[in-house]
A protein has these predicted regions:
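Short functional linear segments
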Residues: 1-46, 53-66, 71-73, 107-114
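ATP-dependent carboxylate-amine ligase catalytic core
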Residues: 29-30, 34-37, 63-156
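Hydrophobic alpha-helical packing residues
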Residues: 57-62, 131, 270, 350, ...
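Beta-strand->loop->alpha-helix junctions that form or flank phosphate-binding loops
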Residues: 72, 198-199, 211-233, 250-254, ...
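Acidic, Mg2+-coordinating active-site environments of NTP-dependent enzymes
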Residues: 109-111, 134-142, 158-243, 260, ...
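Nucleotide phosphate-binding/pyrophosphate-handling subdomain across enzymes
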Residues: 133, 138-143, 149-162, 166-170, ...
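C-terminal helical cap/extension that packs against the catalytic core
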Residues: 201-220, 235, 303-306, 312, ...
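Glycine/aspartate-rich loop-and-adjacent alpha/beta segment that forms the canonical ThDP
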Residues: 419-437
């Protein structure tokens, strides 16, 4: 099986639909010899910040000498970045080899009358099998959706259950209220593991703490108020947090204060469990961490930022970052959103301060809110100084935004936001401009 054939096979699986619960992936993993049972996990759930916490934590562990697997969703640059070891993506040949083994297992299951796994279940099984074959010391694992019934939650050997910020998202899918969403996500806590959480709303905190205590888990909450910022701009910050002094980080944005404090508390929890993680590894890991689509700077003149803010909480933090870093600059937004998100709130938070807004269709045609409908939503809250354009393509939006940003000596910043799903195309389209300004 070639890589192309493996991707085609995976794409074809989406037509089979899905069966709720973990029985299907358990059956697949059993057919593969339960590779997840030979691995140790740091399992991360949350609404916003999971990816950044994963990036910091896994890079620090790699710098400390632990062979560290990463499983992330969604991806930004390449499909292959979904499965990584020490920051290196799985290769096309490795992907094809693992997929062939999984296809054979699925064929055997289907012959027994078992259901076909979902795409995400197959990807998760691939990751477990790959990490076992590569003999990873630890795997930092990001949930796909929710927690308790998420395909990643088949694992048993959770060393640390981690919660990034939990807020309202995927209403009606994993819960109808914030409390129900938090309860679902708390399902990743396993008996006796350590639990680390971001600073949560009080009702969420009570749910997580109660679940942790019921399973005899030590519960630790990050304290972002103990972080002192020494230097900061749109390219990163220098900070101190508790005993970690003068640390450098190259992912900017308001939300990174919270994410950094969570990651450092995870590292402290692991140290208490006997993992050898020196301060130098923490320093080197933070300095080396890059995470595409999280307030990522593509250009400095003009400033071009891509950020995956896709819900109300993320939009508020993006707005705070914009106000902090770009006071006095004209704001140009490129925006694409999914129609099943609370996009009106994203628009109401971000768009009133913009000079121009270019709306686009997302690559996923089934879920995208059409650019024209998004433009209509923007017009409902536009000011007299704002212009709104529904573009035919992401490339057109990038070209027009960049041209306007550079047409005279005015200070302007371009921000592409609304979803992670189209940022790879923004990055690709922008490359020709920023390489030859």
């Amino acid at each position: 099986m070639t890589y192309k054939e493996a991707r085609v096979y995976l794409d074809e699986m989406s037509k089979y639909g899905s069966v709720l619960g973990l029985d299907t992936i358990r059956g697949l993993l059993r057919e593969l010899g339960n590779p997840q049972d030979d691995l140790k996990f740091i399992h991360i759930a949350g609404t916003n910040g999971k990816g950044s916490v994963l990036a910091y934590t896994s890079m620090i562990l790699s710098k400390a000498g632990y062979k560290t697997g990463r499983y992330v969703s969604p991806t930004v640059i390449s499909y292959l970045e979904k499965i990584q070891i020490d920051g290196k993506w799985i290769s096309e040949s490795e992907f094809a080899e693992i997929m062939e083994e999984i296809k054979e297992a699925i064929d055997r299951l289907v012959c027994k009358g078992e259901p076909v796994p979902t795409v995400f279940e197959v990807e998760t099984a691939m990751a477990f099998l790959y990490f076992k074959k590569q003999k990873c010391d630890l795997v930092v694992l990001e949930t796909g959706l929710g927690g308790e019934t998420d395909a990643t939650n088949v694992i048993k050997n959770t060393v640390c259950a981690v919660f990034a910020t939990i807020s309202v998202d995927h209403l009606g899918v994993i819960g109808d209220t914030l409390e129900e969403i938090a309860q679902t996500k708390s399902g990743i806590i396993k008996p006796g593991c350590t639990v680390v959480s971001a600073r949560q709303q009080e009702n969420v905190r009570l749910i997580l703490r109660k679940k942790a205590e019921s399973l005899n888990c030590i519960y630790t909450e990050a304290e972002p108020e103990q972080m002192s910022i020494e230097e900061e701009d749109y390219k990163g910050l220098t900070f101190s947090y508790k005993k970690y002094m003068h640390m450098q980080n190259h992912i900017a944005g308001e939300c990174q204060r919270e994410n950094l404090s969570v990651a450092l508390e995870v590292i402290e929890s692991l140290r208490k469990l006997g993992y050898q993680i020196e301060e130098g590894a923490v320093r080197d890991g933070l300095d080396a961490t890059r995470w595409a689509g999280r307030f990522t700077c593509l250009s400095e003149d003009p400033v071009v930022i891509v950020d995956g803010a896709h819900n109300e909480d993320a939009a508020k933090k993006l707005k705070t970052s914009i106000e902090r870093y770009f006071t006095g600059e004209e704001l140009i937004l490129i925006m694409g959103v999914f129609k099943d998100k609370e996009y009106e709130k994203i628009v109401q938070i971000l768009c009133p301060s913009a000079k121009r807004v270019y709306t686009v269709d997302l690559p996923n045609k089934e879920r995208t809110l059409p650019a024209e409908k998004l433009a209509e939503c923007v017009r409902d809250c536009m000011t007299e100084q704002m212009s709104v354009y529904a573009e035919k393509s992401i490339g057109d939006a990038v070209a027009k935004a960049y041209t306007y940003a550079t047409e005279d000596s005015g200070k302007r910043a371009v921000i592409a936001c609304g979803s992670l799903s189209y940022l790879s195309e923004v990055i690709r389209c922008m490359e020709g401009y920023v390489q030859n300004p």
